[in-house]
Amino acid sequence: GGCLPHNRFCNALSGPRCCSGLKCKELSIWDSRCL
């Protein structure tokens, strides 16, 4: 699963992740940033 085109987040089913470039990365739920 890649990044969703309309925002910076990944598919919700993949858990707390966000986009970094074209890849999904883990999202730090404490500071809401990509790790």
Curated annotation (Swiss-Prot):
Modified residues annotated as Leucine amide in this record: 35
Localization, UniProt: Secreted
Major location (coarse): secreted
Tissue note: Expressed by the venom gland.
Disulfide bonds: 3-19, 10-24, 18-34
GO annotation, cellular component aspect: extracellular region; host cell presynaptic membrane
SUPFAM superfamilies in the cross-refs: omega toxin-like
Function: Insect-selective toxin causing rapid but reversible paralysis in crickets. Suppresses the excitatory postsynaptic potentials evoked in lobster neuromuscular synaptic preparations, possibly by blocking the presynaptic calcium channel (Cav). Induces instantaneous reversible paralysis when injected into crickets.
Domain comment, as recorded: The presence of a 'disulfide through disulfide knot' structurally defines this protein as a knottin.
Protein name: U2-agatoxin-Aop1a
Organism encoding this protein: Allagelena opulenta (Funnel weaving spider)
